[in-house]
Amino acid sequence: MTSKSVVVLDYGSGNLRSAQRALERVGASVQVTADADAAAAADGLVVPGVGAYEACMTGLRKIGGDRIIAERVAAGRPVLGVCVGMQILFARGVEFSVETSGCGQWPGSVTRLQAPVIPHMGWNVVESGPDSVLFRGLDADTRFYFVHSYAAQQWEGSPEAVLTWSRHEGPFLAAVEDGPLSATQFHPEKSGDAGAAVLRNWIERL
C-alpha cells in the first residue's frame, strides 16, 4: 500500500522533527515545509505549535498558513492541529489580557486554565465518545501527555463535531473531530504507544 503523504507545516513553532518521526513511525511519508503548494497537495496537513498564541499566529500568517488551512478545510482535505496548533484554530486566544485573532475555523476563545497549578503538565486520561475515530481501539484509562496553560474550555461549534474532554481542575477540550478538521491539545508525538495509535487512526482516514 502506498504511504500517505503528510506535510508538517513549518511556521517557526512546534516540535517539527518529533512530529515528523512520530508520523513516519506509523507509516506516513512526511515532509516538513512552509511551502504552500506542498501543503495543498499532501494527503494530510499537520499544524504543530508551542509557545504563545500571538507569536504562533504571527508566524502562521507570515507564511500564509491561515489561508492554507482555510483552503484545505473548505476543500474537505484533512488537517490535524496539535497543542497550540489546536488552539489557533479557534476564533481568538486570550493571554495576559491580550486578545489575538486566530484562524477562526471554530468559534470561541482559548483562555487560561482555572487551576492552582499551571501549567498542566504530565499524563492524563481523556473522555472520548463512541463516534471518535482518533481514539478508536483505545481503552478508557489510556493516558496522553499534556503541557499547556491555556485551552478551549467550552465548545460553540457544530453540534455534529466529536468532542473529547479532559480535566485539570475544570474540564477542557482534549480533542475535536469536525469533518476534515481534527485537533488534539495533548502531544501525540510525546504520548508513546497511545499517541502513535491516535496518529495511525488519523492517517488511516486520509
UniProtKB/Swiss-Prot annotation:
It comes from the Bacteria. The keyword Transmembrane helix does not apply. Heterodimer of HisH and HisF. This is Imidazole glycerol phosphate synthase subunit HisH. Pathway: Amino-acid biosynthesis; L-histidine biosynthesis; L-histidine from 5-phospho-alpha-D-ribose 1-diphosphate: step 5/9. IGPS catalyzes the conversion of PRFAR and glutamine to IGP, AICAR and glutamate. The HisH subunit catalyzes the hydrolysis of glutamine to glutamate and ammonia as part of the synthesis of IGP and AICAR. The resulting ammonia molecule is channeled to the active site of HisF. Residues 5-206 form the Glutamine amidotransferase type-1 domain. Pfam families: GATase. Its main location: cytoplasm. Keywords: Amino-acid biosynthesis, Cytoplasm, Glutamine amidotransferase, Histidine biosynthesis, Hydrolase, Lyase. The keyword Acyltransferase does not apply. GO terms for cellular component: cytoplasm. The active site is at C83 (nucleophile), H187, E189. It catalyses: 5-[(5-phospho-1-deoxy-D-ribulos-1-ylimino)methylamino]-1-(5-phospho-beta-D-ribosyl)imidazole-4-carboxamide + L-glutamine = D-erythro-1-(imidazol-4-yl)glycerol 3-phosphate + 5-amino-1-(5-phospho-beta-D-ribosyl)imidazole-4-carboxamide + L-glutamate + H(+); L-glutamine + H2O = L-glutamate + NH4(+). GO terms for molecular function: glutaminase activity; imidazoleglycerol-phosphate synthase activity; lyase activity. PANTHER family: IMIDAZOLE GLYCEROL PHOSPHATE SYNTHASE SUBUNIT HISH. One of its GO terms (biological process) is L-histidine biosynthetic process. Its EC number is 4.3.2.10, 3.5.1.2. It is found in: Cytoplasm.
